[in-house]
Amino acid sequence: MVQRSHRSLVLETGGIQDRNSAKPFQVRRLYCTPIFHAFSFPEMVVNTIRLGFPSFYMRRFDESFADKIHEFGITETMAAPAMLLKIIQWTEKHEEKRFKLQGLRTILCAGAALASRLRASFLQLFDSASVRIVQVWGMTEGGWFATFWYPEHDDTGSIGRPLPTCQIRVSEVSRAELPDGRQVGELLVKGPQLLTAYKGHPDATKEALHDGWLRTGDIGYCADGKIYIIDRAKDIIKVNGWTISPAELETVLHQIPGIVDAAALSYGTGTKEHVAMFVVAEGPSLLVADIKHHLLQQVARFKVATCEIHLVDSLPRSPSGKVLRSVLRHQLQAHYDNVDSGTS
């Protein structure tokens, strides 16, 4: 269990406060993300009361979302990327839902990497060009670390600028240089809002905190005062000595017509480690061969030459919208166990 002080929460909620008085619309929030999540809690519970803007809560995120936006005059909401995808799918089935979304002005987005194509597709739902998708980066161990404040728009793929209470840098231990000269590595965060300890686990606390710097496990870089995330360190795939980002592959997969959801992960160990992809298609017409052909046109051959692709009905996700890669890996192992035993 993560231990944080009262002071850390006070500093975080003050640091994430947006410039509501500068907005040319009344802030009216609809919340439908898990209240216990580090992304949701400081806004849903603390700032809602502290700042006093009208707030509405859905018991669960479902197809009535657009109806609630229209009914209660909602201007801002919070969502994970998977939720944005669902909203797009609902509007494709029911055109009136797109109309009911038009009052939205700001969508705070966190919980997983937001693919550029998904971001663009969601913004196309709106007649107004002033609608903003604002990414948020953080974790339970310290709440929010970075975001953008009104009225800044960003279309560079950044997850935000550091909060006033945060220092963010790239670890010197894991640092590497990209071809364009950018220094990339594990991102470290320091500030008074960080956890005090993992309760009952002093070794884990010592591993996570070094001289006050928290190891986030996220690989990224800093440029022009903005933070960019490449992928989670634990999710990085290594094939024959080459490093592959699942997020990069998933972004390309989401750009293929007919694909509504996708995930990439590593499978196997040592020399047998390779890329495994799971794809949710709109219909039966999409073939694995077509997906492989598209991938070979968009990314370096070594990244996908030995990959395996599986068409599935859905992807397992956590309440916050993150793909549960461990579940997919377990399902894949079970599949091969059945094949080896002759039961599949």
UniProtKB/Swiss-Prot annotation:
Pathway: Secondary metabolite biosynthesis. Its EC number is 6.2.1.-. Keywords: ATP-binding, Ligase, Nucleotide-binding. It is an enzyme of class 6 (ligase). It comes from the Eukaryota. Residues 2-239, 248-322 are annotated as: AMP-binding. One of its GO terms (molecular function) is ATP binding. GO terms for biological process: secondary metabolic process. Gene3D superfamilies: 3.30.300.30, N-terminal domain of ligase-like. Belongs to the ATP-dependent AMP-binding enzyme family. Acyl-CoA ligase; part of the gene cluster that mediates the biosynthesis of squalestatin S1 (SQS1, also known as zaragozic acid A), a heavily oxidized fungal polyketide that offers potent cholesterol lowering activity by targeting squalene synthase (SS). SQS1 is composed of a 2,8-dioxobicyclic[3.2.1]octane-3,4,5-tricarboxyclic acid core that is connected to two lipophilic polyketide arms. This is Acyl-CoA ligase clz12. It comes from Cochliobolus lunatus (Filamentous fungus).
